[in-house]
Amino acid sequence: MVNLSRSVALISVFLLPLLSFSFSVDNPTDRRVLVLLDDLSLKSSHSIFFNTLKSRGFDLDFKLAEDSKLALQRYGQYLYDGLIIFAPSTERFGGSLDSKSIADFVDSGRDLILSADTAASDLIRGIATECGVDFDEDSSAMVIDHTSFSVSDVDGDHTLIAADDLVKSDVILGKTKIEAPVLFRGVAHSLNPTNNLVLKVLSASPSAYSANPSSKLSSPPQLTGSSISLVSVMQARNNARVVISGSVQLFSDRLIRSGVQKAGSPNQYEKSGNEQFVTELSKWVFHERGHLKAGNLVHHRVGETDEPAIYRIKDDLEFSVEIYEWSGKSWEPYVANDVQVQFYMMSPYVLKTLSTDKKGLFHTSFKVPDVYGVFQFKVEYEKLGYTTLSLSKQIPVRPYRHNEYERFIPTAYPYYGACFTTMAGFFVFSFVYLYHK
């Protein structure tokens, strides 16, 4: 019996790395995703979206949100690197899963897609609040728009929105423009103004508002116009990414296949922009796009190749760093003209924009300031949609040694002149005083 226990323990130790599928900086798409559903029928009703993920190499693990065996970790190691929650009405997750464990999941650098709907539970609302998003407090409210609705909803309550106010970012939504409007039916949310990490990806039109479509308005709605966000994203400081949608139907086969014509527009589209929208958005949230890595930070004196242990004030130096972007299949050279380096001690004494050879190498040269102390080379790069880069390397700077100063300092020439003039004047005065009567 003892031998059997030891064997099981050994097998667990060897299998654990295979189960964890921890996020790899060198291979961002080698990932396993847990999909939590209210009903397993969503697996077929949202099959187009799930199949696009599978076709890109993701391993999806479908489970009911109330499954008693739910767990994100085993033996202190995460089993998944991505989490999709399509369970808006779930009041309580099964197993060891709760809002805190999901927050810890994101804090560990992993990614989340959270989708709410009408009558979203307090659990789902709480998770969204943790991510900087607040859903309408009225659980029966939906987004209504009497001017930007889909013409297929012309005789309805105008809750099927044809939205086309998309974030202008090739990194988040891809380089190919989404021509057709995105169909949306769901709840509105607003962004927490104190959270600068959250961004609207799909916004409502100025004529939209959030209210119960089955009852008359007795007071002005709390959420109106462009302040309503339909889909938002967040990139945490640890580069974990989160997508928050107010509609599960947004990802459904029915809306993906549906034709669309926006009210008041002559343009008709055989297919909505939903598939392109959710596909491109999923590429971003799962780090298939906009994922940077940097390394090989090198510095040395001009004309040398070895990195010194210390610099002297007014030394001429060269600095370089390599930056690459994940293309979805391989690392490609990152090309940009806004990467900067700081030569930093309490504040930046030198701030230089780096030149690039378009092969991933960014470089510059500058003179060490006439200040000695402990400095840092710092590269802090933050750009919309891209992972944040933060690199630093410490280096001391010393003053001149006593035998390194110039023999005669040009700026001291006036003082030299004053000294010799005084001596000459004293000699003349003494001669005149002693020998002249």
From Swiss-Prot:
Signal sequence segment: 1-24
Keywords: Endoplasmic reticulum, Membrane, Signal, Transmembrane, Transmembrane helix
Membrane topology category: Single-pass type I membrane protein
Ranges facing Lumenal side: 25-414
Location of the protein in the cell: Endoplasmic reticulum membrane
InterPro entries named among the record's database cross-references: DDOST_48_kDa_subunit (IPR005013), OST48_MD (IPR055459), OST48_N (IPR055457)
Assigned GO CC terms: endoplasmic reticulum; Golgi apparatus; nucleolus; oligosaccharyltransferase complex; plant-type cell wall; plant-type vacuole; plasmodesma; plastid
Transmembrane regions: 415-435
Cytoplasmic side: 436-437
Pathway entry: Protein modification; protein glycosylation
Disruption outcome: Embryo-lethal.
Example of a GO biological process term: protein N-linked glycosylation via asparagine
Chief localisation class: endoplasmic reticulum
Superkingdom per UniProt: Eukaryota
One Pfam family in the UniProt entry: OST48_MD
Assembly, per entry: Component of the oligosaccharyltransferase (OST) complex.
Family: Belongs to the DDOST 48 kDa subunit family.
Protein task: Subunit of the oligosaccharyl transferase (OST) complex that catalyzes the initial transfer of a defined glycan (Glc(3)Man(9)GlcNAc(2) in eukaryotes) from the lipid carrier dolichol-pyrophosphate to an asparagine residue within an Asn-X-Ser/Thr consensus motif in nascent polypeptide chains, the first step in protein N-glycosylation. N-glycosylation occurs cotranslationally and the complex associates with the Sec61 complex at the channel-forming translocon complex that mediates protein translocation across the endoplasmic reticulum (ER). All subunits are required for a maximal enzyme activity.
Protein name per the record: Dolichyl-diphosphooligosaccharide--protein glycosyltransferase 48 kDa subunit
